[in-house]
Amino acid sequence: MTSLVVYSSQSGNTRKLAEAVFETLGGKKEIYPVADAPGAEGYDLVFVGFWLKAGKPDPESAEYLARVGNARLFLFATHGAASGSEHARNAMAAARTLTAGADIVGSFSCQGEVVPKMLEKARSKSQPPVWLADAPDAVGHPDENDMAALQRQIADLRLV
């Protein structure tokens, strides 16, 4: 099996998850930041990781997701919102809509620590984003437990 891991990371959170995915995979595998990533053609399984901007995948990842065609995908994301929150679920749903035709075999998301600059910007808005209230709980995430949960989920799917 040939696997591709593609990720976008502003603060390093999604990169940590991407590296955990990469460690889990057997067979032939490659890992790239989204800016350098090849297309999904020729890979048996593509893992795409992204951070959220305005409740959706970041722009670079959104563009990549729109180009994957009918590839087999596993989506993963980091965000300031609580894991399992409506914000997180809606963001993953938005990612799925970008991948029309793809076979999405799984998804995972967890909190990721929000960088101070982003927190400051969010607090200054006249209508603060919904995830801001959850941001204090995101400190230190993704942690070893988050990465282990992602790796278990991938192993349980028996994809690789």
Regions found by a protein language model. Name each.
Residues 1, 41, 102:
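Structured loop/turn residues at beta-strand edges in well-structured enzyme cores
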Residues 2-24:
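N-terminal beta1-alpha1 ligand-phosphate binding loop
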Residues 23-30, 45-48, 53-160:
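FMN-binding flavodoxin-like domain, especially the glycine-rich phosphate-binding loop
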Residues 30-42:
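Short acidic low-complexity segments
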Residues 7, 38-40, 66, 97:
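Generic structural signal for beta-strand residues in well-ordered domains
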